[in-house]
Amino acid sequence: RTILEIMARLDIHDEEIAKRLESKEYQSLLKKTFREWSGAESEDKRTYIRNILANAAASSMTSDEVVRLFIDWLKMYSELHFKVIAVIYKHGTNGVSRGGVWSDLGKAEVAENSADADLFKLLFRDLSTGGVIRQHREIDYYGNFVPKTPQRRPKGSGPKPVTSAFDDEDSYELTELGKQFVHYAMTDLPLKIEYNPNKGANQEL
C-alpha cells in the first residue's frame, strides 16, 4: 500500500525521477525502510515514511545520508516529539518558548514536579541532543551566530531560580536538519494519478 501511494505521487514519466527510482541509492533507502518498518506503529508515522520516500525520489534538496537519518528519527522519536517539531516549525524563525509550545499543544496546566512536566523537558532534551531543535539565536548578515550577551545577576540576589519546564524566556527553533525533516516527512506531494486504497494490494508497510 505504501509503495502504491508513493508511486501515485510521482511523475514516473519524468526521466530524472525514473532514473532516481531505479538507482542503487534509492533502492537502498527502500530496503532500509522495509527492513526496519515491517509495520508502522501508527498511521501518522506510516504517512511520514511515505512522504520521506516520495520526496526523496522527487527532490535532491538533501543527501541520502540525511534521508537515512530522517528514517532513523521516525524510529527514535514518539508522536509527541513530532507534534513539538510541528509547533516549533509553525512559529518560524522567531522561535517559540517551551511554555508557548505547551499552550499550542492544548495541554492543561500541571505542576512543575509532575510526570508530565518531566516528560515535556525530556522531549526538548531529546530533540536538542538529536540536532532537531536549538535555542533561538540571532545571526548576522553572513549567517553566523551572534554571541549572546551574558546576563549578570546582581550581587546578593541569591541563587539562580530553577528554570520552569514551561519557561517563557528562551525560545526554540528548528535547526537546518529539523527544517529539512519537516520538508521531507511532513510535506505531502500532490497525487499525480488517482489512488484507491480499496483496490489492489492491501498490504501495509
Residue ranges with predicted function:
Residues 48-51, 83, 122:
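Amphipathic alpha-helical interaction segments
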Residues 1-77:
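Charged, alpha-helical interface segments at or near domain boundaries
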Residues 11, 89, 93, 128, ...:
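Hydrophobic/aromatic-lined pockets within catalytic cores
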Residues 68-71, 138, 155-162:
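Active-site-adjacent structural elements in folded domains
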Residues 43, 62, 94, 133-136, ...:
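Intrinsically disordered or highly flexible coil/loop and linker segments, enriched in small
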Residues 60-113:
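Short amphipathic alpha-helical interface segments
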Residues 146-205:
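Short, amphipathic alpha-helical interaction segments positioned at domain boundaries
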Residues 79-80, 111-157, 167-169:
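Short amphipathic alpha-helical interaction segments
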